[in-house]
Design a protein with these regions (language model features):
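Membrane-embedded transmembrane helical bundles of large multi-pass transporters/channels
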Residues: 1-36, 40, 142-383, 503-735
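Structured non-transmembrane domains adjacent to transmembrane bundles in polytopic membrane proteins
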Residues: 43-65, 70-171, 382-553, 559-578, ...
Length: 735
């Protein structure tokens, strides 16, 4: 099997720890652009996105913020319009603010708000007169860092009890929370990972080595995101996910090294044997996980492309760190690892494995029974598309959105952009029809306030500039329905049909804004989930088939993997919990990666024991005992790391993802141990006929491992955990 060179190990550590690129990577990570606007990942071909781009380019409104100003002081006195105008002017002076629309743009605000025309009053004043509303638009899109800074400046000058709403304000709140909480997530995940490894591993030193190696991999992965930028979701969970994915490979190698150390003359020989013996599980697991993440790149919502590339890159860097850097660290610090060994606090799985093997038909039958229910429950899980709901209740945007609904009878704003060459009389008919659509609370349009008989030449330029630019006209429609709900989607569809009726083929018309964008988000992700699931299944099937040179094994493992994913999502259905819209796609890829790691580890070890001459029952008993230890360590580590983040996280979308990841790690481990173990055993004859080079399958006593005489004489010097011994007999069953 060859040996490692001790000097090469030391050189590897030196290179890993002191490369000039380290500083560049850290600096790149700090300056990586983070996108907080999920809607910006929608395909550019959609009409809602085209309308949003026009709104941004011509009207500076693609990233509108609604400012709610309290007009009644604590003593019940009214705040003068001049005070509100002063605030408006101060907001206008903030960098990147292109326009601020308030009642004074329409008419003289010296007129008391309660005697203004209803059309104006309903748009700019709450029904009880307690709040007034102004619309702030910017010169850049909502995902821009500069806009987030501008929103932060607006917050600083807002009077007490004043709030913000809108996509740009929500992005600002999201940034503040992720910036403050992400370091906490990482610290908690790392701390819990170290504690879990110290409990389940043989040495108190090994967890720190693993975290150090994985830390290097995470640093390089996150630093190389500088060239493409990342979404805040990717930024929040990528490090934790890479920890979970890479730790599987690390644990597989460490446990295999400990096993080979007992039968090798030197530690270098043991490491070479461990790498050779782990090749199938490491290569198969990493390739399937890699293709699972790459499947996300086929999403129309390019958020999938962002997460997919970052995580696929993380898998590659993680595997390289495990096969290059980790062996070097383990060999150099071998004496320290051995000095601080202890008995791991892990259960003895011997009886558990015997129980599963003895009742293999019952466990296999149970697996078949739960396939359909888990699929149905998973298919009916409710998804939450409203990003406002992902923020805490006390966030500025959340409070502002609630006030909009309570005080102004509106929750969502739609923008309609039409060709300005359409006759005014025709536009008025369209506006009246839209105003009568169910759920529309108010509408702001040029002809509704100026009138069709007044020429543009006598209308003030500042009024025209707000609603007319470059041959286009924009209208604002306020809705009582919350974006992403069925009622709001139906409302948007009705408005789109009305606009199409009046614009026809001769003119253009777009409906955009939160409601339209969320509607397209829902329709887009429905297709995305089906496509990515199919692609990932096909890709993983092909990889498993190539790795094992088998037709039957991919079917067995893919079904087990999918059932684990269905159970995870189905639990949310049972408890009536809505999951983030991105969860089915992301969770399926990540849990697929974890489950396939465990499945390939067990299957490859089963094949290896058969090749050594063991009977099928003896081979599975040996394979399961060795594999379950690694599966247990990995599942516990990933569970506690993600569950810890779930407990402290304030952002609902990240919190929900971590909850499902934590739950999924346990489900994946249980599915592999409880169901794949007996199914592989029962199907071994079929597998042997459909797999090239599978090996023997008849039951026979397990041979003793071949131990070199030199190692036998000195084996007592090593402080390894005592292996569980089994006595295998041919029970005569056709297993």
């Amino acid at each position: 099997a060859g040996e490692f060179d001790q000097r090469s190990s030391g050189s590897t550590i030196l290179i890993a720890g002191r490369t000039p690129g380290d500083k560049i990577i850290v600096i790149s990570y700090i300056f990586t652009n983070v996108n907080y606007d999920i809607l910006s990942y929608l395909p550019s071909k959609l009409d809602s996105v085209k309308g949003e781009n026009i709104l941004e380019e011509d009207f500076g409104g693609g990233s509108m913020t609604i400012v709610l100003v309290k007009t009644v002081d604590d003593n019940g006195g009214k705040i003068s319009p001049n005070t509100v105008m002063k605030l408006k002017n101060n907001i206008s002076e903030i960098k990147n603010v292109s326009n601020v629309l308030w009642a004074d743009n329409i008419m003289d605000t010296s007129v008391p708000g309660d005697i203004l025309p209803d059309d104006v009053k309903n748009v700019f004043y709450s029904s009880d007169g307690e709040y007034t509303m102004m619309f702030v638009s910017y010169s850049e899109d909502a995902s821009s860092k500069d806009i987030i800074k501008s929103v932060k400046e607006i917050k600083k000058i807002l009077p007490e009890n004043s709030y913000l709403s809108g996509i740009s304000a929500m992005n600002s709140d999201t940034k503040e929370m992720t910036d403050s909480e992400t370091p906490i997530y990482i610290l908690i995940a790392v701390a819990l990972a170290i504690i879990t490894m110290m409990i389940t591993m043989e040495s108190y030193v090994m967890p720190f080595i693993l975290v150090g190696v994985i830390g290097i991999a995470v640093m390089y992965n996150m630093g190389t995101n500088f060239f493409m930028g990342v979404s805040y979701i990717t930024q929040s969970i990528a490090a934790i996910l890479q920890l979970g994915v890479t730790i599987d490979y690390s644990i597989f190698l460490v446990n295999r090294y400990n096993e080979e150390r007992k039968y090798s003359r030197t530690k270098e020989e043991a490491m070479a044997r461990a790498l050779h013996g782990s090749f199938i599980s490491l290569s198969g697991s990493s390739l399937t996980t890699l293709f699972g993440f790459l499947a996300l790149c086929f999403m129309q919502l390019t958020l999938g492309l962002n997460i997919g590339i970052v995580m696929a890159k993380g898998v590659i860097i993680g595997v390289l760190s495990v096969v290059i850097i980790l062996p070097a660290f383990m060999l150099v610090f071998d004496s320290a690892i051995n000095r601080h060994k202890h008995k791991p606090f892990t259960p003895d799985f011997g009886k558990f494995v015997n129980h599963i093997i003895k009742r293999k038909k019952a466990f296999a039958a149970l697996f078949i029974i739960i396939i359909i229910p888990s699929l149905l429950l998973s298919a009916n899980v409710k998804k939450n598309y409203n990003l406002n709901a992902e923020l805490p209740d006390d966030a500025t945007t959340t409070v502002g959105t609630v006030l909009l609904k309570e005080k102004f009878n509106m929750t969502t704003s739609h923008f309609i952009i039409v060709d300005d060459s359409i006759p005014a009389s025709k536009l008025v008919r369209m506006e009246n029809e839209i105003s009568n659509v169910e759920g529309v609370s108010s509408m702001l349009a040029y002809d509704m306030f100026v009138g069709t008989s007044i020429p543009d030449s006598i209308v003030p330029d500042d009024v025209i500039d707000i609603v007319k630019q470059n041959g286009r006209q924009v209208m604002l429609v306020n809705s009582i329905y919350e974006s992403s709900t069925d009622k709001c989607n139906e409302q948007v569809e009705k408005i789109e049909n009305i606009v199409q009726k009046y614009t026809g083929s001769e003119h253009y018309g777009y409906v955009t804004g939160e409601g339209a964008l969320y509607k397209d988000l829902i329709e887009t992700t429905k297709v995305d989930f089906a496509v990515t699931s199919l692609i990932s299944i096909i890709a993983v099937f092909i990889v498993i088939a190539i790795v094992f040179k088998s037709i039957s094994i991919p079917f067995i493992l893919i079904i087990a993997i999918e059932v684990a994913i269905w159970i995870n999502q189905g639990i949310s259905t049972l408890f009536g919990t809505a999951i983030p819209f991105i969860a089915p796609t992301v969770i399926s890829c990540i849990q697929l990666g974890a489950t396939v790691d465990y499945a390939i580890l067990l299957t490859s070890r089963f094949k290896e024991e058969l090749a050594r001459g063991a009977g099928r029952t003896a081979a599975m008993r040996k394979a399961a005992n060795e594999a379950i230890r690694s599966v247990f360590q990995s599942a516990m580590l990933f569970f506690f790391a993600t569950f810890g983040v779930y407990l402290v996280c304030s952002i609902s979308i990240v919190k929900s993802l971590c909850a499902m990841l934590a739950r999924g790690s346990l489900i994946s481990a249980l599915v592999i141990v409880l169901f794949v173990t007996p199914i592989l055993l029962l199907c071994e004859k079929l597998i042997s006929k459909t797999t090239k080079g599978w090996g023997t399958h008849d039951d026979k006593p397990e041979p003793e491992p071949v131990v070199p005489a030199e190692v036998k004489k000195n084996i007592d010097e090593y402080e390894f955990e005592e292996e569980t011994s089994f006595t295998f007999t041919d029970d005569g069953e056709d297993e």
